[in-house]
């Protein structure tokens, strides 16, 4: 057995990077930013399977490049717009899609904005990528004190990270390191660390 397998195991279960809840009907489905449109496609499947009557999207923080293009008269399509279009083309009606107006730049800000925008009794399915599930769950539990149900689900369309062969792919190694660094910062409770989650 190699050191990699003894520390992490081929399926990453020792350090529990991956997390996924058993589904049950909820108030809404939240699509976390990133990996457009793959997370939105999973949300559309969940919606059509009857798990929730509404899908929530966040708007990413507009950075300097957005405004530079805009000043040149170049219109950029933002990620939430791609996701919205993917939902519509997947058969989700427009009235079932909610876009939160607040611009956000990380998972913590996304989930905080969702929590602030919805009624207290809301329950959610939170869709992300498989490598991001543990951190998303930790942040949600931190924000809600574990009092608001948020079921974590990864997108089956997003195959960018394979937990059984992650060490063979540079991108997967980067995902793994980034997620563990985020979790370590979170677990250590660094005051500034929360901004990076």
Where do the PLM segments sit?
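Transmembrane alpha-helical segments
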Residues: 7-9
